[in-house]
């Protein structure tokens, strides 16, 4: 099925690429895609295109990669050129998903139907850069996707629609990301179909109550503080998979922890002390309860189930992980 509503798309990672693919495959014309500049990545630190750029190039869609869209920012010439390109490209609406650049009011006003953002939380909870991680870390029972009409604030625009999903006790950021990316892709296509049909999308202002901010994940947050309750540390491990992973230092070596669960245990050992080692898991005393680690990675190694990890590394009851220093 082909459509007439012309969509400029702005996004960068896999989450955004899923939405772009759905919009394009639904038959909406996409005359231009904006995505962040190529970045060094991988062991060789070679420049790599974003998932959104790769999809656009594979399907013959024009791509622009301005480092900024703010005329008064660090890259005024590139921002001005990109804004002029937007003005010169006939389109009806702009869709934004995990783009990573601030859109000034001047840009928000270009498209006749404005800019629609696909945000991976139930707004106003978890506005900001890392809503999926923070929802798991906080122990939220559910999260979802919100479509909003963008304004100049940070994820403060009026809400168009939402879809909810439960957060399972086994969900990681990776699994929840994929589920939300699929849900967001469907939701935006449905919204674009309605916008084309009726010429408008109803929206309601975000409530003032319940707003929280999802800070970007910092590498130092990976370190587990064993003085905290085991249930919180288990959520931290799930929230930080695939990045940056849970980290624990033993005898100067930093181990990555990729899978762990809280266990009910009245441990008298000091927090961080290994109290049990078996092929089923490494149990570590916490401030409250204990954490059973079932997947680990040593420096330079691969993620391994604990049984395989123990075949090449020695862990013993009585050893103690270092206590993370507060940042």
Swiss-Prot record:
Binding residues annotated for (6S)-5,6,7,8-tetrahydrofolate, in chain numbering: 121-124
SUPFAM superfamilies according to UniProt: FMT C-terminal domain-like, Formyltransferase
Pfam families with a match to the protein in the record: Formyl_trans_C (PF02911), Formyl_trans_N (PF00551)
Keyword Methyltransferase: no
EC number(s) on file: 2.1.2.9
TM helices/strands, residue ranges: none
Leading EC class: transferase
InterPro entries linked to this entry: Fmt, Formyl_trans_C, Formyl_trans_C_sf, Formyl_transf_N, Formyl_transf_N_sf, Formyl_transferase-like_C_sf, GART_AS, Met-tRNA-FMT_C
Catalysis performed (reactions): L-methionyl-tRNA(fMet) + (6R)-10-formyltetrahydrofolate = N-formyl-L-methionyl-tRNA(fMet) + (6S)-5,6,7,8-tetrahydrofolate + H(+)
Superkingdom: Bacteria
Entry GO CC: cytosol
Gene3D superfamilies from the UniProt entry: Formyl transferase, C-terminal domain, Formyl transferase, N-terminal domain
Keywords: Protein biosynthesis, Transferase
Keyword Translocase found: no
Family membership noted in the UniProt record: Belongs to the Fmt family.
Purpose of the protein: Attaches a formyl group to the free amino group of methionyl-tRNA(fMet). The formyl group appears to play a dual role in the initiator identity of N-formylmethionyl-tRNA by promoting its recognition by IF2 and preventing the misappropriation of this tRNA by the elongation apparatus.
Protein name: Methionyl-tRNA formyltransferase
Native source species: Paraburkholderia phymatum (strain DSM 17167 / CIP 108236 / LMG 21445 / STM815)
